[in-house]
């Protein structure tokens, strides 16, 4: 089932690189969904977790992962851990060589994600934190890439500060009645914004 889904995403041009393709095949999505949704794990759709959180649709996980151009040795920050699935995919995409830090504002979700990450052997490559992701994770900055899995009203300035020069922020931003996914590249004191597509994410929560 995973292979069929990944082949579909590859044929649709969402998965572009062999690295992301291998990562999507390596991570068992059924281990990151609630038990009652395991049979739906390889449908290309978001699925409910708890506390109004969701696990993103596979196409969105793959797209965001491709946008940060993963490579071995990268240091990635994820804002909005959810169940830990995106963090695990990122860990595989950097070939488990580097570090993925992920921060979740809902304590119960952070605990759930940490349990998933540890059970599946990603602990040490992935570190899970409980806190306000809009503030980033300054103690581990700067980052090569930051992925935000919830929609912000504006680009959080702290996240830009915590990017390396040339680093990439992938984030959905609320615009009018919708949301737009942006790839933002830091160039010295300036940023380059590129709109990718319209999306639908849960809102980025305040602490």
Curated annotation (Swiss-Prot):
This is Protein-L-isoaspartate O-methyltransferase. GO terms for molecular function: protein-L-isoaspartate (D-aspartate) O-methyltransferase activity. Catalyzes the methyl esterification of L-isoaspartyl residues in peptides and proteins that result from spontaneous decomposition of normal L-aspartyl and L-asparaginyl residues. It plays a role in the repair and/or degradation of damaged proteins. Transmembrane segments: none annotated. Belongs to the methyltransferase superfamily. L-isoaspartyl/D-aspartyl protein methyltransferase family. InterPro entries: PCMT, SAM-dependent_MTases_sf. Keywords: Cytoplasm, Methyltransferase, S-adenosyl-L-methionine, Transferase. GO terms for biological process: methylation; protein modification process; protein repair. The gene is pcm. Pfam families: PCMT. It is found in: Cytoplasm. The active site is at 56. One of its GO terms (cellular component) is cytoplasm. It catalyses: [protein]-L-isoaspartate + S-adenosyl-L-methionine = [protein]-L-isoaspartate alpha-methyl ester + S-adenosyl-L-homocysteine. Its EC number is 2.1.1.77. NCBIfam families: pimt, PRK00312.1.
